[in-house]
Structure formats: C-alpha cells, structure tokens
Amino acid sequence: MKSTLRISLKSGERIFVNGAVLRVDRKVAIEFLNDVTFLLENHVLQPEDATTPLRQLYFIAQMILINPEGADQSTAMFRKSIVMLLNCFKHDEVLAELKRIDGLVTQGRAFEALKAIRGLYPIEDQILNAQELTPATVEQIRKEIAPWR
C-alpha cells in the first residue's frame, strides 16, 4: 500500500478484515497503515440476494475475501463461473469487463473485482429485462454456480 487508508464506521457497523469480523460499538475512524484485505458490511451480499448471474459471481468473489481459509475453493468456483458467464453473455462491454475482472482476481485484487462486478449490475438488469439471456439460461447458470443454496 503506497499510502494509508482511512475509513469511518458507524456505531454497530461491521467490517470484515483479513477474514475476521469486527463490529464497532461507536462511531470510529480506522486507519490502515499497511496492506489489508477488507470488506465493508454494506458491500456484503447475502446468499439470498445472489439472484442473478453477476450477483452470484459477486457472492463467490466476496467469499475469497471474507473466508481466506476457503479462498482456493472460492477461486476455483470463481474460475468455473467466469468461463460459464463468458460463454453466456453476448454484450461486448460485459464480456470485456468480465475478462478484466478475471484478471483482477488472478492478480489477487478481489476487492477491485467486486467493485467492477457491481458496476455491471445496471447492464445485467437491462439484459435480463430484455430477455437477451433466456430465463432457461439464467436458471442453468444459477444451478451451476450456486452450490451454497
């Protein structure tokens, strides 16, 4: 990390830091002085909210950060999912971004990958609303990359 990173948390808010879950009892500011892997509570996607292909991919990528002990398994599932999504989506911007996201995860930059996946949600919503991905395809993806259900 080239510089320190300072974040503010509200009372009762949780943060996931290097696999540990921390909850603060009052408003605080935390300054990270070195490299750290963290995820703010408001960016954590719950399993029941992983209802679309990209949200499922996000859930898998966040598990790489939240559960370091299972990172190898989550990364393998991420790779399988990326391949499937690259074969299903036809939208050029989505395909290019999925390739970039795959590279970010390969480089150990899962936090940045999560931000990039969130950025694709509006396009995915348009694709799903226009049924550019058929409901059957979406259901097949859901079955293949959602073993936590």
From Swiss-Prot:
GO terms for biological process: bacterial-type flagellum organization; mRNA catabolic process; negative regulation of bacterial-type flagellum assembly. GO terms for molecular function: mRNA 5'-UTR binding. It comes from the Bacteria. The keyword Repressor applies. Belongs to the FlbT family. Keywords: Bacterial flagellum biogenesis, Repressor, RNA-binding. This is Probable flagellum biosynthesis repressor protein FlbT. Has a post-transcriptional repressor function in flagellum biogenesis. Associates with the 5'-UTR of fljK mRNA and promotes its degradation. InterPro entries: Flagellum_FlbT (IPR009967). It comes from Rhizobium meliloti (strain 1021) (Ensifer meliloti). The keyword Repressor applies. Disulfide bonds: none annotated.
